[in-house]
Amino acid sequence: MAKVAKTHEDIEAQIREIQGKKAALDEEEGVGLDSTGYFDQEIYGGSDSRFTGYVTSIAANEQEDDDDDVSSATFEQKKPGYHAPVALLNDIPQSTEQYDPFAEHRPQKIANREDEYKQQRRKMIISPERLDPFADGGKTPDPKLNARTFKDVMQEQYLTKEEREIRQQIAEKAKSGDLKVVNGSSASSAAQPPSKRKRRWDQTGDQTPGSTPKKLSSWDQAEVTPGHTPSSLRWDETPGRAKGNETPGATPGSKIWDPTPSHTPAGVATPGRGDTPGHVTPGHSGATSSARKNRWDETPKTERDTPGHGSGWAETPRTDRGGDSIGETPTPGASKRKSRWDETPASQMGGSTPVLTPGKTPIGTPAMNMATPTPGHIMSMTPEQLQAWRWEREIDERNRPLSDEELDAMFPEGYKVLPPPAGYVPIRTPARKLTATPTPLGGLTGFHMPTEDRSMKSVSDQPSGNLPFLKPDDIQYFDKLLVDVDESTLSPEEQKERKIMKLLLKIKNGTPPMRKAALRQITDKAREFGAGPLFNQILPLLMSPTLEDQERHLLVKVIDRILYKLDDLVRPYVHKILVVIEPLLIDEDYYARVEGREIISNLAKAAGLATMISTMRPDIDNMDEYVRNTTARAFAVVASALGIPSLLPFLKAVCKSKKSWQARHTGIKIVQQIAILMGCAILPHLRSLVEIIEHGLVDEQQKVRTISALAIAALAEAATPYGIESFDSVLKPLWKGIRQHRGKGLAAFLKAIGYLIPLMDAEYANYYTREVMLILIREFQSPDEEMKKIVLKVVKQCCGTDGVEANYIKTEILPPFFKHFWQHRMALDRRNYRQLVDTTVELANKVGAAEIISRIVDDLKDEAEQYRKMVMETIEKIMGNLGAADIDHKLEEQLIDGILYAFQEQTTEDSVMLNGFGTVVNALGKRVKPYLPQICGTVLWRLNNKSAKVRQQAADLISRTAVVMKTCQEEKLMGHLGVVLYEYLGEEYPEVLGSILGALKAIVNVIGMHKMTPPIKDLLPRLTPILKNRHEKVQENCIDLVGRIADRGAEYVSAREWMRICFELLELLKAHKKAIRRATVNTFGYIAKAIGPHDVLATLLNNLKVQERQNRVCTTVAIAIVAETCSPFTVLPALMNEYRVPELNVQNGVLKSLSFLFEYIGEMGKDYIYAVTPLLEDALMDRDLVHRQTASAVVQHMSLGVYGFGCEDSLNHLLNYVWPNVFETSPHVIQAVMGALEGLRVAIGPCRMVQYCLQGLFHPARKVRDVYWKIYNSIYIGSQDALIAHYPRIYNDEKNTYIRYELDYTL
């Protein structure tokens, strides 16, 4: 409307125009009179339909519709809520479907925390048992037994070494391009000298020694054909502990050095660490035809016919489970292509039970390629396979062909069965089956449904009987327990195996009582079970990749216990045990390392030195560094167990080995580990050990030189401060070495010199320090982190010796030291940080605090917080050691200014800054007075900060500086701080509240009760509700503060308030922390002293009725403390009266209180002994064991307290009540009774006790004699001299004079 209508015509025209526009509008856009608002559609919803938001149609098929459009429309209509900005919401990690809220609380598996180096232990193979040369009186073993001797093991070790070298040569040739593909005999004869005679182990499988046709070598085949898995490798004999040479999951082919399989017991068939016999391959024993066979592979005729004479794996299923743990962890580099022979032995174990599958042991792919898997196979299936198998089983069960009997029952009479047409073949469509069966088992053709199949409706995944829960990871080890069998039908070996399995399952997964019983049983029956069956089951469990710390601890404990019992029977299994236990020696967990040492120590004592040396000798020059490292550590443990002298000849031979540098390296490492492990115990043998390894310092191998220097360093560290004369012979080569070497070698030589210098006399130390310092200063700028650590350590050691002057350090060492080491990156690595701080503190001890602090004080204002922390920690340690005497006024100002800045700028939560601030302020003492207002201003400002951490640090700082404020007479300032802290007692963060209470406690301690502001009468009622707080820090600080007030200022508070506090204190007796319970109990004593014992005692006696034992025990202690504080006569009447209550807990509590009471009051008990005797008579005759136990404890404390006060009559009376309890079997009761008898021996003398004893010492019953001799022995130990006069008289006979007349002399 451009203009306002004024005439009638204009108005009419305008109306028509508006109506026209309205008609043109969409009807939906209009707003009705009673419809929902148009502009507020997003609030109220603009739709009239009552069906809005509902799904209006359902999909015809069973799939869900896409409802996105509907749901989004519905969400658009909802009212907008008030919530945080989207950016903040996106920062919060949303939980996914896979999120496990309990993941962090689950016990971590050992495998999860292992680095790549430690994971090599899972590649180790548990070796077969070896021959015990000492068995049968050292007779020569029967060659038919094929026992593995030391010679066999060394030969296999040699072959493995040669194999690795050849592989390396091939790899180098391939790299350089010299490796050629050779086809045909002519090419091969051209490549090789024709006349050279092959050794027989260089011949391929199908060649005879006589004829040597030139054929492509197996190595060339392996290299030339990528992805080809050779079926029979000549070196497959010993995969050894080689580092990734063999894929543990792959099964090696036939080998040249196969022992004859037919005589091998099943338990032997565990592939070994450098000892794998060829017959371990399942399937190669006769079921497969190898690509190449040679005459060594020929086996007795019966092999194919009788399953029992096959390979060790096929005889008794899973007798030796050595391969299980290895096969199940595939090597990351394993070949992608897998043949069915590559299956792990573990997964085939289930099918090797001849009872359940007819014919020979099946070798096909387990579980999924079998019509009816055996229970063992079922356990090796994945959950998906198991589910598919169950479904198929159900379908087969429903659709199975009906039998004639069932058809007869269904149809009326008169029907007859028609024969099928000639040539009719029923349709078989295995593709439709969920799990197809490609090959019939055991040579049986056609359809075969075992009858057992119908009875076994489903296989339980938990063992029956009283056995603990089986985890999914455990099934492969304990699967036999899932099959219910009649044990009487099993052979003795199988029964034994099942028994061991049950006991191990109880130990691993059972409850503590179940575990205890099983552990005792397996220990007692260890010799009966035998070493082989036990270790064949325990060791694979220990190699399991899913093992947890607690489980490993329990299994190691089992080994420890059975070692004692088995003793020399363990010899053939020493190497097996070492393979599993040696990795514990390099575990990051200290307790695991201790357990490993303990096992190896006991093993050495059981097996003897000769067995240990012959077992571990092949591993000393193993190609794998991991094996050599763990072997060296194990040898050190053997040396500590059997004595260093017994091992010295062997070590001398190993360290001087000319054959391999690896042996020399390991021998010297053994010496180093002995020094680390045994410490100063090496001193008697120091010269011998140094002589053994000194030649290593000039060895041609760099690694040997390095380890020799490190071993010298370890020996010197262990011998400190003695033994410099033993190192005379190595000083010259070390001295030459530090001038010749660079890098790691130099670092090791410097370390050795660094440990030798502190052993020297002052003038020698000074000379050597000056000489070595030139090289050290040169190495200050080395970029190598390891070198830096060693240089810092050596500087610290050199500067710590007496002969080095402060002047020399100031001029020569300090400038380059601070230039190269006090840098930001040194603060980032924790080990460098620690070493730098320690070295700087050592330098300060020589040159004075001011010299060092003046160089680093400005760095307190550095922008890098980690660097500031390092500076602060150094200053704190220097001032803690040397004080602030040589710090001048200017440096003092810089120090306070820098510390305040660093304190305010800190963002991390550790206490370095706090400790540093406290140490510096306390060291400065009165000199800090001018800075106190500034410090307190900072503290008050930070107490008001919004960050809880900042408030906590401010409160902690008050508690650190309160003593200095008192020294500076700043009581007014402290009073002000007290008021401010009182106002902050409403703090909601428990950590901060605990710190505030700690600060109040510190102020109360130094300012005293009467000057305290706020006054105590206002402060204590404010603390009472805080006692309810369940946070340990709050509880501890609060109860300490209340106890201090109760001790020193009880008169400022009304008795009613103290009683209220008493009731709150009862709850604190339940605290987990012992310090809180102890403070609470003491506070009861202070309160009783302040307001009298009666009210407090009434509260405590009521608390004896509670169920919780810890609460009752603490209550009894509190009662005893009240008695001690307020004299026993105030407490005893009420206590003895309480004993009348016919309730077990109360009576036991009273007796316990009496026990503590007489323990605390000591000789004051002489006045009360007659009063409590009737009560003790009743308790000692009670049927309840605990009554008699506690009453015996009372008698013990009472008798020890009243010794020499003439109360023997009463004690003798009580002895008559105690004595009948000597035959109790409960360990707790007998311990209390023996304690009472010990106390009575002291109080009434050994004479009376011996008179009681004599009647039973020669009793006809052994049980009686045992008890009486035990009592007599304890009397004898305690009063040996006093007994002489009281032995019974034995009169002289014709030959002997027994009477000692001098004992009858009287003066």
Swiss-Prot record:
- The segment annotated Disordered runs over 61-84, 111-151, 169-363
One Pfam family hit: PPP2R1A-like_HEAT
Coiled-coil segments: none
Recorded GO terms, molecular function? Answer: mRNA binding
In terms of SUPFAM superfamilies, this protein maps to:
ARM repeat
Question: What GO cellular component is one of the record's annotations?
Answer: U2-type prespliceosome
Keywords tagged on the record: mRNA processing, mRNA splicing, Nucleus, Repeat, Spliceosome
Predominant subcellular localization, coarse grouping: nucleus
Q: Where is the composition biased (Polar residues)?
A: 204-220, 345-355
Which residue ranges contain the repeat HEAT?
532-571, 572-606, 607-644, 646-680, 683-721, 766-804, 846-884, 1013-1051, 1055-1093, 1125-1163, 1166-1204
Q: Where in the cell is it found?
A: Nucleus; Nucleus speckle
Q: Which domain of life is it from?
A: Eukaryota
Cysteine pairings via disulfide bonds:
none
Some GO term, biological process aspect, for this entry: which one?
Answer: spliceosomal complex assembly
Bias category Basic and acidic residues: which stretches?
Answer: 169-178, 234-244, 294-307
Question: What is stated as this protein's family in its record?
Answer: Belongs to the SF3B1 family.
What is this protein's function?
A: Component of the 17S U2 SnRNP complex of the spliceosome, a large ribonucleoprotein complex that removes introns from transcribed pre-mRNAs. The 17S U2 SnRNP complex (1) directly participates in early spliceosome assembly and (2) mediates recognition of the intron branch site during pre-mRNA splicing by promoting the selection of the pre-mRNA branch-site adenosine, the nucleophile for the first step of splicing.
Q: How does it assemble?
A: Component of the 17S U2 SnRNP complex, a ribonucleoprotein complex that contains small nuclear RNA (snRNA) U2 and a number of specific proteins. Part of the SF3B subcomplex of the 17S U2 SnRNP complex. SF3B associates with the splicing subcomplex SF3A and a 12S RNA unit to form the U2 small nuclear ribonucleoproteins complex (U2 snRNP). Component of the minor (U12-type spliceosome) spliceosome.
Q: What is this protein called?
A: Splicing factor 3B subunit 1
Native species: Xenopus laevis (African clawed frog)
